[in-house]
Amino acid sequence: MLFDSTIRKELARSFGATLMVILTIFMTNLVIRTLGLAANGAVAAQDVVFIFTLLALQTLPTILSLSLFIGVILTLGRMYRESEMAIWFSSGIGLARFIRPVIATSWPIVVLIGILMVFVWPWSYSQYNDLRQRFEQRADVLRASPGQFQASGDGHRVFFVEKAASAANAGGRNVFIMNDLGTRESVAVSQSGKIENVGNDRFLVLDSGHMEQNDKVSGEHTHVEFKNYRVLAGTGAAPNNSAPSPRAVDTVDLVLTGGPAYMGELAWRLGLVLGATNLLFMGISLSAANPRRASNWGLLFAALAFVIYYNLLNLTQAWVGNGHVNIVVAMVVLHGLAFALGLGLIWWREHATVIHPMKLLLRRSAA
């Protein structure tokens, strides 16, 4: 049908343009965030691209949902402003008739959001947590980036390596170490160094260098030259037996395991999928605009509705996660009311009638 094909083409074009703009904004922020993590020594420099990919996958469901919502608002809002909606309405097509082409265009995106939330979301968080954990368990000198000072985990030592060490070839040149032991501090500089594993401990072995030691109490200063010097660089980490974060748990395991924290995470994952669907109905009703005015207040109300809805999703996750509300009750109340509100607004826009309480009383008194 001409009507369905027209709406679907316009919506697909608007969704694509909106997605590109929002992706550019979000990806730019993610690049800055990821580079900041690497610069602060929170992640390894060689893992920046993979971490950026994981963070992008985590934000993609929200980006798709927001792009779809704005795409509906922009498409129908333009049709209102250019009086195309008046033509469709005069042809006997009501606002509720727009639901079918909007759903027909949007359902692949909603399914993709569901796949991302059910399968990709926990996998990306699991991979991200594993990378962070493995990096934190590495020796302090192994975490040093070339040309950058790296503080140890306890904050008592500072390392500088001109050529960073690696797990395969644990060597470096022009190594600098400052060690603060409270009452004494020392600075060691060597031409080269390497990592040696002794049991669960890692030692940094320095060759051909010198050390300056200073006693803060007595002020005594000592200069020592050495051919070989060994300093503890890190210890083997104990196995992590703690329960995994709910965000890193598979969706099936969330259902089987139960528990408030897992149910809260499940409410969030399912809520994003249901929220993307409900926002389509809200977008149809909030896109109305006056063709005689250049402004589109519906877009402002739509942005406000999106922010409120997603804040309620976070609030619902917290309530369910703390055990205050049952997940079924929370899902029915939040998403059921949002669905009813979307359909109610469509009905109100289509009929364009509001029964004022005073008019209702006057009708009853006249009768």
Segments and roles (model prediction):
Residues 52-54, 248-267:
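Short, aromatic-rich amphipathic segments at membrane interfaces
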Residues 229-254:
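Extended, hydrophilic extramembrane loops/domains of integral membrane proteins
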Residues 46, 50, 105-219:
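Non-transmembrane, extracytosolic/lumenal segments of membrane-associated proteins
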Residues 39, 258-349:
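Transmembrane alpha-helical segments that form the functional core of multipass membrane systems
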Residues 14-26, 58-70, 105-114, 272-280, ...:
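Hydrophobic alpha-helical transmembrane segments in multi-pass membrane proteins
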Residues 54-155, 343-346:
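Internal alpha-helical transmembrane segments
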Residues 1-81, 366-367:
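Membrane-anchoring signal-anchor transmembrane alpha-helices and their immediate flanking context
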Residues 340-367:
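A juxtamembrane structural motif centered on a specific transmembrane helix
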